[in-house]
């Protein structure tokens, strides 16, 4: 019996791969850190219209997520980019850096 091959067609949702990558990054990061409750992952588009996934961890866990010579961070970025099925930047911040960044952001109004 011969199996029918399905064409590898992209989903009708262009962000489906990026959302899957965001969920996967959250899962992996929570397994790596000592403070999994503080892990936050956000997906947004930067000013150059490039998708960005931002991983925010407790300051004590930053070294675990980056790894020796950045090996863990490189592996996480590789997995996320493969899952996203497209270009995506992965930024890794500690929660203190993220809080400072949001204070520096311009407010509307």
Go through each PLM region and give its residues.
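RNA-contacting regions in translation and RNA-metabolism proteins
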Residues: 1-62, 74-75, 79-109
């Amino acid at each position: 019996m011969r199996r029918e091959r399905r064409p590898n067609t992209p989903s009708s949702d262009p962000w489906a791969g990026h959302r899957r990558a965001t969920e996967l990054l959250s899962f992996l990061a929570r397994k790596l850190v000592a403070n999994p409750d503080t892990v936050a992952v956000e997906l947004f588009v930067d000013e150059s219209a490039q998708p960005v996934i931002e991983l925010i961890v407790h300051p004590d866990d930053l070294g675990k997520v980056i790894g020796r010579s950045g090996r863990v961070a490189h592996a996480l970025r590789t997995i996320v980019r493969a899952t996203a099925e497209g270009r995506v930047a992965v930024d890794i911040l500690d929660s203190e850096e993220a809080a400072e960044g949001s204070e520096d952001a311009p407010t509307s109004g």
